[in-house]
Amino acid sequence: MSEEMDNVTAEEITDKHLQKDLDAEENQNVVKTMRGKVREKLKISKINKGEKSSMEQLVESKIYQRSKLSPQTEVSLDESLSFFILSGEEGSALGKSSEQRPVKDSYPKCFSLGVNLQNVAESEDEEFMKEFILTDLLKVKAADYEDDQEQIKKQKANIFVPSSSPVVNQHKLPKDMMPRILEDEGFYIQRKPEIYKKTCNKMENRLLKLEEGKCWFGESGEIMSLPTPIKQSWNFRLNVRKEPLNPLLKTIYRKL
């Protein structure tokens, strides 16, 4: 028997080790696949960046060539209107001022176009990261919502709220047993502290939910808050003598 138990334990240990190895291999495979997806998408984004950068260079070169070839042909709207509106002397003065204007004024336009294209490319890269890469790495799930009725059902299943309705004596006492009225039988009963009836009913309902809850009820069907007069409880030192007690010394309780 001991050898069989040892074999069983050894097989269980080997099975546990095999399961751990399989779980580790599955986790590694998942990590590898995720890394491969991210690398592929980064490659695609780099290729798109290269195409965008080549297009930007072509646009900038074309703008620079146009500004270099025809620097004198650039005519503003103000100059074209002044040719028809102003007189000869004023037009000649404007022409001189336009000739004195340097050709380098066209370069800021090209620079601003390049900056705008770069900003557009960066914004597109951020959108690409949000749409494709982050959706694979993160799981988006709707927020959990429960109705009020479902929450109340769960609370009722976990929390017990006792009712304030009175309990029938049959539930408090054993089967086929009637409650005893000890005062009518001549027993002395101490005065109990005043308690609201609703709180007492709640306590009785709570005790009856327990497995040994009936032990808290006496033969009268009430909660045992005071020592019962049926069972003798000695508050003094007992007489250990073998001689019998004098019957005249015994106390006899009688109801007046």
From Swiss-Prot:
Residues 1-24 are annotated as: Disordered. One of its GO terms (biological process) is non-motile cilium assembly. Residues 136-159, 194-214 form a coiled coil. Pfam families: DUF5523 (PF17661). GO terms for cellular component: ciliary transition zone. Residues 13-22 have a biased composition (Basic and acidic residues). Keywords: Coiled coil. This is Protein CC2D2B homolog. It comes from Macaca fascicularis (Crab-eating macaque).
